[in-house]
Regions:
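Conserved pre-motif I regulatory segment
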Residues: 52-54, 75-78, 84-125
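Walker A/P-loop
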Residues: 119-143, 452
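Conserved strand-helix element at the start of the C-terminal RecA-like helicase core
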Residues: 146-157, 316-359, 531
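Conserved helix-turn-beta segment of the N-terminal RecA-like "Helicase ATP-binding" lobe
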Residues: 155-180, 361-368
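Conserved helicase ATPase core of P-loop NTP-dependent helicases/translocases
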Residues: 158, 173-185, 199-202, 343, ...
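Post-DEXD/H (motif II) to motif III coupling segment of the RecA-like Helicase ATP-binding lobe
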Residues: 212, 220-284, 531
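A conserved SF2-helicase RecA2
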Residues: 258-280, 291-295, 483-489, 497-558
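Conserved RecA-like P-loop NTPase helicase motor core
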Residues: 380-386, 419-533
Length: 558
């Protein structure tokens, strides 16, 4: 007889060969990395064509992800075979979160999302600015069980703590596990960084018997090793994921759904626009004159190029050191100051500091030293391992850098230890976690007019008065087959939050386009798709268009 035990995973015994094959087929998915390599005509040797989301243990039992439960039950029904099932969940300690703060009355879509998660665990999708954290707090208030809230950054950890203290009047002392702290609080709500749990598995063992609810914030990160090694170990009866961008660039969102549960609710973005919950920005493309040779014969025209490929990194290096491009951007940042507080988003920490230096000089020349600027980033690494196409290149680069190279058997590729910053840059630009927190707080309090930021700002940065955004480095958006522009969606979301102090807030987003370089031009086209998907009116493409800053401001859009 078939036997099924539901816990942090699903254990199945007594199955037939046909049943096993059916389940295995369900949980074997095409490997996006393999498909990407084939698209780019890159070597696929050593890359698995498929990924297995199931395994068998030493006793022969099938071990399946807990998010597969609904589909497994359908399989059992379809086969019409007798079975017995059991659960090994932790209901968790019953707790009283006190009264809900009525200053945070939920809108209809928020109530519907919470109700959907109460009915069944799984993933809920809601755009940035829709109140995901508030909805999460309402959910745990309704559940009344000891809760673990998982985040992937310390900044989100503290923002979540502030929301909990504002909404849950009886939450008591909130536990914090991260940022060097190991405080369990009163045990009602514990907010933890996955990095801390990953490094301290004993904490997971200590929490497992008492935690009945697990919230995975920014759940699209679940496929990362940190989440798989932490969240997937909890036996909590209720696990839910919250995210604004479920689709991942690497195509591994299936891991999220299988690890947490099916998609249970999607908040419609159109309704948020209708009720003023999101501000629709004006998008303006600013065309640069930057030109360079393609990154390489292989990757030059590939929209997927990037990451740790040495050719692409070299191309980006040329871009950020192009003085004419930097000057154009800096001038536009200064010209846009009257439109409101701004965030300047770059993939490169170095570019943030370079642009800030130019902007500060322009402001000083115009007698506008009262305009305050700051740079915030997620941290610096002096060196990083980068991919080389072959051994000869790796050896040559390592000699040039005065570092080392290696062959990674698991990845089947050569890597070079590549300097990211000079010693002076590293010492001048690095900031502590405390300093980063202080900068973000100053920006939140309106003490900073122009904030230069790296990937830190993609998620969770909650500064409602930001009304101007500058996307200053090329990045990929949505492709023809997938919604892979999650990073861009997160970034533009920073200026789409309504400002309670400015009900008439208008927002403008500057996208700097380097259309003389093939790969950057293709990335520009994919970004247009993201804007359209978000319901934003996009200016028409003009083959010969070269918008200048002066032309734009003469149009008097505002």
């Amino acid at each position: 007889m078939l036997q099924v035990v539901y816990s942090n995973n699903i254990r199945v015994t007594g199955y037939s060969t046909a049943f096993r094959c059916s389940v295995a087929d369900d949980l074997t998915i095409p490997n996006p990395a393999y498909q990407k390599a084939k698209r780019q005509r890159r070597p696929t040797w050593g890359i698995d064509a498929n990924l297995k989301l199931w395994l068998t243990d030493e006793t022969g039992a099938l071990i399946l992800p807990r998010g597969y439960a609904d589909q497994l039950k359908k399989h059992i029904e379809n086969y019409g075979i007798p079975y017995v099932e059991a659960t090994d969940f932790t209901s968790g300690m019953a707790v009283d979160f006190g009264d809900w703060n009525t200053d945070y009355t939920l809108r209809e879509y928020q109530r519907e999302l919470v109700d959907a998660l109460i009915d069944a665990h799984g993933v809920a999708v809601a755009p940035a600015g829709s109140g995901k954290t508030i909805m999460g707090m309402k959910y745990i208030h309704a559940m009344g069980r000891a809760t673990l809230w998982l985040t992937h950054t310390t900044d989100l950890m503290y923002q979540t703590k502030a929301r909990a203290e504002a909404t849950l009047k009886g939450v008591g002392r909130i536990g914090i596990l991260g940022d060097g702290k190991r405080d369990y609080g009163d045990g009602k709500l514990i907010i933890a960084s996955v990095k801390t749990l990953q490094a301290n598995p004993d904490i997971i063992d200590a929490l497992n018997p008492i935690i009945g609810v697990v919230i995975v914030d920014e759940a699209h990160h679940f496929p990362a090793a940190q989440f798989l090694e932490t969240a997937a170990r909890f036996k909590a009866k209720h696990i839910v994921g919250l995210t604004a961008t479920p689709d991942r660039k690497d195509g591994l969102q299936t891991y999220m759904y299988m690890g947490i549960g099916p998609l249970r609710y999607i908040v419609n973005r159109t309704s948020l626009y209708k009720f003023g919950q999101l501000v629709v920005p004006t998008v303006q493309f600013m065309y640069t004159q930057f030109d360079a040779d393609p990154a390489s014969e292989v990757y030059g025209d590939s929209v997927d190029a990037g990451g740790d490929d040495l050719d692409y990194i070299a191309l980006m290096g040329k871009l950020i050191h192009d003085d004419a491009r930097s000057t154009l951007i800096a001038k536009n940042i200064v010209r846009a100051v009257p439109q409101g507080p701004a965030i300047v988003l770059a993939e490169s920490t170095r570019y943030c500091f370079m642009l800030r230096e130019k902007v500060d000089a322009l402001l000083a020349a115009e007698g506008k030293q009262h305009i305050k600027t700051a740079v915030v980033h997620a941290g610096l690494q002096r060196y990083a391992w980068r991919v080389a196409p072959d051994k000869a290149t790796a050896e040559r680069k390592a000699e040039e850098y005065g570092t080392e190279y290696k062959y990674v058997d698991k990845l089947r590729r050569w890597q070079v230890k590549t300097p990211q910053y000079t010693e002076k840059e590293f010492n001048d630009w690095r900031i502590t976690a405390k300093q980063r927190k202080e900068i973000i707080q100053a920006a939140t309090d309106g003490e900073i007019d122009i904030l230069f930021a790296t990937q830190l700002a993609r998620e969770g940065l909650d500064i409602p008065h930001l009304s101007v955004g500058h996307c200053v480095t090329p990045k990929k958006g949505d492709t023809a087959n997938e919604k892979s522009g999650a990073a861009l969606e997160q970034e533009i979301g920073r200026i789409m939050r309504p400002d309670p102090k400015n009900p008439d807030k208008k927002a403008v987003w500057y996208d700097y386009v380097d259309d003389k370089v093939g790969i950057f031009k293709q990335q520009y086209y994919t970004r247009r798709k993201v804007y359209k998907r978000l319901g934003i009116t996009v200016p028409s493409k003009k083959a010969t268009e070269r918008d200048t800053i002066d032309d734009f401001f003469k149009r008097q859009i505002f």
